[in-house]
Amino acid sequence: SSWIAAGTAYTNHDIEMIPVYIFYSMFGFQRVGDLAWAAGDSQARGFLIGATAGRTTLAGEGLQHQDGHSQLLASNIPNCISYDPTFAYEMATIFREGLRRMHEKKENVFYYITAMNENYSHPEKPKDCDEGILKGMYLFKEGKNKGKTKVQLLGSGTILREIISASEILSKEYNIDADIWSVTSFNELRRDGMETERLNLLNPNKKPKKSYVQECLSKRDGPVIAASDYTRAFTDQIRPYTDKKFYSFGTDGYGRSDTRKNLRKFFEVDKEHIVAFTLSALAKEQLVGSEEAEKAIKKYKIDKEKDFPANL
């Protein structure tokens, strides 16, 4: 309520304020969803920061605190702009744009940005990535191992780091080139895809416009492997807006009390599972032999008989 009061002070008291409210991501939209909608209805401006976000970033606190769906809840509020960045430069770029839109352009929007409870090194900001960060995805690293087989790896939040590690294994051990895409907002990509699809349907006599996802991926080779620290419904949002074979992975199910490493293994979003799933996806496209995927499954001791995590 205090955040809403500050976020609407520009109209109620003629005082411009940009409030920043940091909270446990699980205790945001899930616990006070009515207030989030009230913020949208009242045209509040400001930043909501969902800390300790993602199903596996908060180790040891089980199902009550491990967030696998706050981004999906945020996606339903029309004037809520939501992001799931991985690195500090992404967060800074998003904050700067948010200040520009809300303070300079006077747009009646508010931002939901998730932040992880995990320490890791942050790389130098790549050149010319601001537009991609804000639109929802950009090419973090291009596979240049000159391998004959290519794959497109998409990741957001803390799981992008598992994607990066998986790409290194694929390159060194399997001679597979992976283009790594940092997806800062599956939600914004979906909104762009929906708008583009609608525009094309309303203009049947014109050349179809490409969604931003299509612009990024259409000229790239290989299937798409997308993973996040949220349920598969989060990454699945962009499936209709790419023509490529698309595989999504996430953390469907209840949270569990364990280490980050074990949690990611359980939910099958660690680097080992991503490597094995990527090889299987490539085998289905007849780009690698199925025996390579079988060997990887055995090598990483992945239990084929284990039930789907959401059923456990």
Predicted regions and their residues:
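Thiamine diphosphate
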Residues: S1-N76, S82, Y89-L99, I164, T235-D236, ...
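Secondary-structure boundary/capping residues
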Residues: L48, S82-Y83
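Single, functionally critical "micro-switch" positions that shape active/binding sites
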Residues: T86
